[in-house]
Amino acid sequence: MADFDMVLKCWGPVEADHATHGSLVLTRLFTEHPETLKLFPKFAGIAHGDLAGDAGVSAHGATVLKKLGDLLKARGGHAALLKPLSSSHATKHKIPIINFKLIAEVIGKVMEEKAGLDAAGQTALRNVMAIIITDMEADYKELGFTE
């Protein structure tokens, strides 16, 4: 619970502008891990230099951060929120679990730069994301999705 609370203390700036922060997260994910762009076919025709200003990238990034905010606010009691997310990402989108680990690190960097998440907060975010991703992985296994 303490880790969730520590991350939530810095969540305000993110929550105040999901679209801008979401765009930063996805653009950085695609820059640092170009292979992840292949997992988003709807962004395939967008030139790399245009990703940051693309409304679709911004909207999807906002969706990611809104869902993460809901999971954070559940403070560990997130099973009902996570199940449908796990299901769609395993069965429809076919997103390997490793990609959640990659985006979690990017979210941490963006939160450090834009929301003041300090070193202890970074550790708390890693702990929180490890819990969420482990639970997603268990959902994936139940669904028979293995990378």
Curated annotation (Swiss-Prot):
Catalytic activity field: Fe(III)-heme b-[protein] + nitric oxide + H2O = Fe(II)-heme b-[protein] + nitrite + 2 H(+); H2O2 + AH2 = A + 2 H2O
Coiled-coil features, chain-numbered ranges: none
Xref: InterPro entries: Globin, Globin-like_sf, Myoglobin
Subcellular location(s) per record: Cytoplasm, Sarcoplasm
Keywords recorded for this protein, A-Z: Cytoplasm, Heme, Iron, Metal-binding, Muscle protein, Oxidoreductase, Oxygen transport, Transport
Gene3D superfamilies xrefs: 6.10.140.2100, 6.10.140.2110
EC code(s) of this entry: 1.7.-.-, 1.11.1.-
S-S pairs: none
Binding site for heme b: H89
Name of this protein: Myoglobin
Native source species: Channichthys rhinoceratus (Unicorn icefish)
Taxonomic lineage of the native organism: Eukaryota, Metazoa, Chordata, Craniata, Vertebrata
Name of the gene encoding the protein in the UniProt record: mb
